[in-house]
């Protein structure tokens, strides 16, 4: 994984970002970006996300993370999915907004989505 990623100005005028119900979901989405692998994927377990992305923000509980993920999936910013009973997520427009140099990136860390999406009740 890269140490950092680009955050382009287009995020400010994104209709999908505007459709998110909370600023918490917007913040979490942007803070995810440097943690994504070369394909725009990361763990989808709310507890892991809490511990990795927002470990020091007490207001961000695992339940709040789960609500934010459901909202991101609802507007089409992420695909939240299962592989072998483990949750992962895929940012849907990652390649459009990142200039990836695959020769310098580490190998894929997270499995590709199959046909199973996660719902907030899962």
Predicted feature residues:
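Short helix-coil junctions and helix-kink-helix linkers
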Residues: 48-62
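Short alpha-helical segments that sit at the start of domains
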Residues: 4-43
